[in-house]
Amino acid sequence: MTDNNAPGAMTFALKLLGLRSHSKDELKRKLLKKGYSAEGIEPVIEKLSRMGALDDHAFGMEVIRSRSRRKPSGRLKIVAELRKKGVAETIISELLKEYDSVALCHRAAEKKLASLREMSEADRKRKLEVFLSNRGFEWQEIQSALRLLVLPGADDDEPC
């Protein structure tokens, strides 16, 4: 379906935004995939931006807040997710200035440790390192969490 119909594109865009927030780029891609032309999409994106319904900064903040609450992740994973959704690098940098990934790493580690109680200390440490690394936390943050949770063998000099 190829459609230059801006009102149709606006209706579809509002439907998508009613489900959840989107970045400008993400919404553009979905409208293009639906079959609307680039010429029909551009005015819709501009109008939604002027109305405040489409704001990459607010969208990025919402992603970070949601991720922090639901499934704590490190900076690396947050950056990758925001890039994938089309948020500009300048906005990502600005949003991450206040991001406390060390505290989130500690919280994620504490929660995960509850499911690792039956394992040996060495296995717990290894599993926790892999888990936190997969969540996008950096090595220093992981080691800090291991030290805080008093896991023997969490040595700064040993790589993961």
From Swiss-Prot:
Keyword field contains Cytoplasm: yes
Output one GO BP term.
regulation of DNA repair
One GO cellular component term noted in the UniProt record for this chain: cytoplasm
Q: Which UniProt keywords apply?
A: Cytoplasm
Pfam families from the xrefs? RecX_HTH1 (PF21982), RecX_HTH2 (PF02631), RecX_HTH3 (PF21981)
Instruction: Tell me which InterPro entries the record gives.
Output: RecX_HTH_1st (IPR053926), RecX_HTH_2nd (IPR053924), RecX_HTH_3rd (IPR053925), Regulatory_RecX (IPR003783), WH-like_DNA-bd_sf (IPR036388)
Residues annotated as signal peptide: none
The subcellular localization recorded is:
Cytoplasm
Q: What is its main location?
A: cytoplasm
Name the protein family: Belongs to the RecX family.
Protein purpose: Modulates RecA activity.
Q: What is this protein called in UniProt?
A: Regulatory protein RecX
Species this protein is from: Pelodictyon phaeoclathratiforme (strain DSM 5477 / BU-1)
